[in-house]
Amino acid sequence: MSLWINGDWVTGEGERRVKTNPVGNEALWQGFDASPAQVEQACQAARKAFPAWAKLPFTARQAIVEKFATLLEANKAELTRVIARETGKPRWEATTEITAMINKITISVKAYHTRTGEQHTAMADGAATLRHRPHGVLAVFGPYNFPGHLPNGHIVPALLAGNTVIFKPSELTPWSGEAVVKLWEQAGLPPGVLNLVQGGRETGQALSALSDLDGLLFTGSAGTGYQLHRQLAGQPEKILALEMGGNNPLIVEDPEDIDAAVHLAIQSAFVTAGQRCTCARRLLVKNGAQGDAFLARLIEVTARLVPDAWDAEPQPFIGGLISEQAANNVIHAWREHVARGAKTLLEPKLVQPGTSLLTPGIIDMSDARDIPDEEVFGPLLCVWRYDDFDSAIAMANNTRYGLSSGLISPDREKFDQLLIEARAGIVNWNKPLTGAASTAPFGGVGASGNHRASAWYAADYCAWPMASLETPALTLPEALNPGLDFTQGNGHESA
């Protein structure tokens, strides 16, 4: 039984789905997709549960969410195993994902009070009060790269605010989605407050088409995000929060410590096998001897990265991609770049056919032409050379995306210029592009999305503000507006 609707585990009525390990190819999970009718049932359950959940004292909702955090800690080893096996990422990285999920609970509670709690301002004749109210029924679409952590960044603040949720994990990570929801069940969520529907495109389309939804929170590709935006066009009554991808630039301007710069570039481009939306896709390196030395060392160290299974010992820096198809997509993109005139510096290769284990690739795009502005979601780093910093910033901004941007340089003035001119929601200096704080906004501009998904700023789109002017006693003002006469017995006499 792969669906959780109104507090019951039920069997999907749609197509059968089998999830295999992308490296070892053993079957991990099997179940059935939700039918459109079951998606509708999940929405009805969420709608029915909403009034009582929203009326609960915040402390009661907080207690359940904090119980969920306790269960995450108690089940960390097992959930790590599930996520690592299903995604292909190494054990060490899956463990950090669970830790991030736990840490976001406390931050989300604080964010609720700080950003969307109640604020009272005393006035001479009463008070002005700002309150926040939940939207109602929200759909949450989860991605596959962080199947626990990223949906958690929507679900936790949504529940704290008093919303009810229909959660659709990625069709590539149904096992992780189910494992997380089972912990929510143990935490004591009332029936219908959180509902799980499994499936691919058809399930997603049925969910986003529900007329009774009050909003949709999405993390995933720009293509799907654009489709959802079109589907919900003309429905301003629904909140739509999109966190999408990026074609992110990392500028390298005469680094003083070559190895430190190389380490930062590798962390930016290849962690999670390049499957983070903030990963560096474009490396802009200044022409000259320092830039040449940096590139040579980057190629040398990257060539030593050997992807391996999730439980390999010693642990690898990167594991497999989410699927063999995803690995083949990266190889296809590399070949397309070569056909357009790019020069291969380090060829990406499948470690073993039939698996998703792919070595990182580096390619010089300086002489390539007609390169599409698309996110290649995997370990492929494209290099451009530049002569002056103004040109580097222009190249960095030459994308429809605007998620992350970064600079490796000892020069603070260069970073100050980038801060003013960069078109990105995240701009880092001598820090990996993939580094982010849960207390900071996470998101970008342009094709990278609209709202800022994270434990802190997610509170903003999980509740709407209600302004009130209020006083316990109603009295006639001492000073009246012109034309108003409340003098006793001074009205018009009847004929």
Curated annotation (Swiss-Prot):
Q: What are the catalytic residues? A: 243, 277
Q: Which domain of life is it from?
A: Bacteria
Q: Which Gene3D superfamilies match?
A: Aldehyde Dehydrogenase, Chain A, domain 1 (3.40.605.10), Aldehyde Dehydrogenase, Chain A, domain 2 (3.40.309.10)
Q: In which pathway does it act?
A: Amino-acid degradation; L-arginine degradation via AST pathway; L-glutamate and succinate from L-arginine: step 4/5
> What GO molecular function annotations does the UniProt record carry, in alphabetical order?
succinylglutamate-semialdehyde dehydrogenase activity
- Residues bound to NAD(+): 220-225
Reported EC number(s) for this entry are 1.2.1.71
Catalyses which reaction? N-succinyl-L-glutamate 5-semialdehyde + NAD(+) + H2O = N-succinyl-L-glutamate + NADH + 2 H(+)
| GO biological process assignments | arginine catabolic process to glutamate; arginine catabolic process to succinate
Identify the InterPro entries for this entry.
Answer: Ald_DH/histidinol_DH, Ald_DH_C, Ald_DH_CS_CYS, Ald_DH_CS_GLU, Ald_DH_N, Aldehyde_DH_dom, SuccinylGlu_semiald_DH_AstD
Q: Key word Cytoplasm present in the record?
A: no
The protein's role, per its UniProt record: Catalyzes the NAD-dependent reduction of succinylglutamate semialdehyde into succinylglutamate.
The UniProt entry, under PANTHER family, shows:
ALDEHYDE DEHYDROGENASE-RELATED (PTHR11699)
Its recorded name reads: N-succinylglutamate 5-semialdehyde dehydrogenase
Gene name of the record: astD
